[in-house]
Structures are given as C-alpha cells and as structure tokens.
Design a protein with these regions (language model features):
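Charged helix-capping and loop-helix junction motifs
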Residues: 128-138, 168-172
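A cross-domain feature marking catalytic cores of carbohydrate-active enzymes
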Residues: 118, 153-155
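Substrate-gating cap/lid alpha-helix
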Residues: 158-172
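Alpha-helix C-cap/termination motif
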Residues: 108, 144-145
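A short helix->loop->beta-strand "cap" motif at the edges of active sites that frequently abuts
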Residues: 146-150
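Surface-exposed amphipathic alpha-helices with a cationic face
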Residues: 139-143
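N-terminal, intrinsically disordered, polar/charged segments of Gram-positive cell-envelope systems
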Residues: 2-46
Length: 172
C-alpha cells in the first residue's frame, strides 16, 4: 500500500506507516501516577522543568503562561542534557544568564514540582549504576535545598533509526 498515486514512479518505494499493533493500556505499577482532574494553569505555574532544548517549546509556543513562565524552563547552554551529567549540569538562567546547578535553581525559586527530562545523548556509554548514581546525587542535592519540591523523573525514550522497534512498550 502506498501513499502516492499509482502513476507516480516513486509510489512503490514510499510505504504507508503501519498502525500501532499494541493498544496503549494503563500501566499497573506502584510507580504509575493515577489519573487526576485538570488543575488548570495555577497548577502548571508551579512546575519547573530541567531538560534539553526540546523543552524550550513550552515557552516558545506559550504553553506556560503564568507570571513566572520565563523562569520555569531550565536548559544547559549546550542545549543538551545527557542523563550521565545530571549531577554536574549547569543551567542557563533565563533571568540572569548565569549558569547554575539545579539545586541552586530550586533553592531560589522553591518550585512545588520539578520535572527532570534528560536527553538520551551518549546513553549507550553509561550503565544502570551510573544512571542511578547521577539521579540520586541530583535528587538529594535538590531535596537538601528545597525539601518540599516534588520531583518527577521522565523516562528516557527508546531510540531507533527505523521502525523495527516500533512495538517497544513498558512491558518489555
């Protein structure tokens, strides 16, 4: 099946993507967050984000609209946040332009929630123990300076150069 007209010679080499075979089902895990009602922008205004340049879309597309929206997204100068450097990364302040570690951001701003979204850069060069160590160091540093901040760690997404792995799920 192709996505181009039959008279197009390139039609035979442009396949239509296969729909997802496995439906998304709720994860049964003690770590899974329960579904909640929409809390609106007041709730979102309390969330700070540490991550790579892909998070900047939250600001450029005006998804964050509160009085502190410019202070809610923190990205390293390089635009990349490899998981292996979570414990040493410094983030460019959208307010001062200074580069500061995550715990100082939280000490000054006291966010109710901190979402950590590392990039998968160089992830193949680290192992499970290293990842656990850098996350633990970062979380402990943040908690020491902002003990009431709730921390949400985003998972790293699987990366593949083709659709061979399209059926990867949390059940694997």
């Amino acid at each position: 099946h192709t996505s181009k007209p039959k008279d197009d010679p390139a039609a035979a080499v442009t396949p239509t993507p296969t729909p997802q075979v496995n439906p998304i089902t709720p994860i049964q895990s003690s770590a899974a967050l329960a579904q909640t009602e929409d809390k609106g922008s007041t709730y979102v205004d309390q969330i700070y984000f540490l991550g790579d340049k892909s998070l900047k879309v939250l600001q450029t597309e005006s998804m964050l609209t509160g009085k502190d929206a410019k202070k809610q997204v923190w990205v390293p100068d390089t635009g990349s946040l490899p998981a292996s450097s979570l414990d040493t990364a410094k983030y460019k302040s959208p307010v001062t332009g200074n580069n500061v570690p995550a715990d100082e951001i939280c000490e000054v701003n006291k966010p109710a929630y901190l979402v950590i979204c590392p990039s998968a850069d160089n992830i193949s060069m680290t192992n499970e123990e290293q990842i656990k160590s850098v996350y633990t160091t970062l979380i402990n540093a943040v908690k020491a300076k902002s003990p009431n901040t709730k921390i949400i760690c985003c998972s790293l997404t699987p990366i593949a150069s083709n659709y061979q792995y399209e059926d990867i799920t949390n059940e694997l």
